[in-house]
């Protein structure tokens, strides 16, 4: 018997794949939404215990049908653009993958006839350049990139849907994560420092 039905967007990525490995051990029923199977080896230990559906998160029709069919108790939204440079090269795509996808999922949850928790994977980049260090959750946000601005907008959507509609929304800001399965990106600070 499964404990929770958990739908994870971006479940084959660095953070998502480690989360999948942990959740599978706890016997949750998991569905991964991914736009590409290129990182399938990230979950080689767990892939027989999860459902994988190839859907681009900006295909809202297919994403909505998958949510309705799976009937999740929890949606963990980790998918989206994570590149600052790509957000400047194609800002419209960044809005689609980071901002509109979050809003679509929240709206879909609002329409469901049962409660569903929403967890947003955000980033410390929403803070921008802080006036003092160290930063904490109360540090004012002043993003300096398109990516950071879209992620902050997604956080605000979560807060609004919680306050106005009573949705159970949570936000966690991922900060300089690194480790096995990480995609090597030339301008990522933590990896370059190490």
What are these regions (language model features)?
Residues 6-26:
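N-terminal Rossmann NAD(P)H-binding glycine-rich loop of SDR-like oxidoreductase domains
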Residues 57-97:
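NAD(P)H-binding glycine-rich loop region in Rossmannoid oxidoreductase-like domains
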Residues 28-38:
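Conserved glycine-rich Rossmann-like NAD(P)H-binding loop of the short-chain dehydrogenase/reductase
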Residues 47-59:
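Rossmann-fold cofactor-recognition segment
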Residues 77, 103-146:
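Conserved Rossmann-fold NAD(P)-dependent oxidoreductase catalytic core, especially the SDR/UDP-sugar
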Residues 9, 33, 75-79, 118-124, ...:
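SDR active-site strand-loop-helix element
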Residues 132-133, 156-194:
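NAD(P)-dependent short-chain dehydrogenase/reductase
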Residues 146, 150-153:
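Active-site helix of classical SDR
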């Amino acid at each position: 018997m499964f404990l929770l039905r958990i739908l994870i967007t971006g479940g084959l990525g660095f953070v998502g794949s480690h989360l999948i490995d942990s959740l599978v051990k706890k016997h949750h029923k998991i569905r991964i939404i991914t736009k590409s199977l290129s990182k399938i080896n990230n979950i080689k230990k767990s892939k027989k215990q999860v459902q994988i559906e190839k859907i681009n998160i900006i295909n809202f029709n297919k994403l909505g049908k998958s949510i309705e069919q799976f009937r999740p108790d929890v949606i963990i939204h980790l998918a989206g653009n994570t590149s600052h440079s790509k957000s400047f090269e194609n800002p419209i795509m960044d809005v689609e993958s980071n901002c509109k996808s979050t809003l679509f999922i929240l709206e879909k949850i609002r329409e469901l006839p049962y409660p569903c928790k929403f967890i947003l994977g955000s980033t410390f980049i929403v803070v921008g350049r802080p006036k003092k260090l160290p930063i904490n959750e109360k540090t004012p946000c002043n993003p300096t990139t398109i990516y950071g601005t879209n992620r902050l907008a997604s956080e605000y959507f979560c807060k609004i849907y919680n306050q106005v509609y009573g949705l159970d929304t949570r936000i966690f800001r991922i900060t300089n994560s690194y480790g096995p399965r990480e995609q090597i990106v030339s301008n990522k600070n933590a990896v370059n420092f190490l």
